[in-house]
Amino acid sequence: MKTVFSPAASAALIFGAATLAGWPVRAEPNRVTFPENLDQLVHYTTVRRGNVTEHMLTSPEAIAAVKDGKPVPNGTHFVLADHRDGKLYRYFVMQKGDGWDADYDDRRRTGNWQFQWFWPDKTINLNENTNRCQSCHRSQAGSEYLYTGYRLPRFSGTPIE
């Protein structure tokens, strides 16, 4: 049996495939939650890049674990509060959970860490590509996938810049 598509159906199929091939990747559902205890997290370092100021926060337990040479505990949040021109623009949240690495294939694994972007109102920023976060943070495997992890042992109560 021969299947024949009408010219309109063929055009729709080709247009649809072309559109999807160029469709931008968006945030994906994952296990990351916005920390309910944001006000209890410790601001341990600040990074400044032009008009962007990034405040990094985490739990006292995570700081103590790193200082003791132990792994960051499961359940830990690391939060980057991204300020642009002095105003909160968005949050980047890394969260660690037991077995979370199994959610991704080997090319995307970052230990048991998952990543999510949030708007200032704490809703998920669906315009961000969390695969990009995983890709960059994979280079930091030796420091729990944290770019600022090396600053934690030096933290003594005042944010390090």
Enumerate the language-model features and the residues they cover:
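Intrinsically disordered and other compositionally biased segments
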Residues: S6-P7, A18, F118
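Short, structured coil/loop segments at alpha-helix boundaries
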Residues: K2, S59-P60, I160
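Bacterial N-terminal signal peptides
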Residues: S10-A21
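A generic membrane alpha-helix/interface feature
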Residues: M1, L20-A21, F155
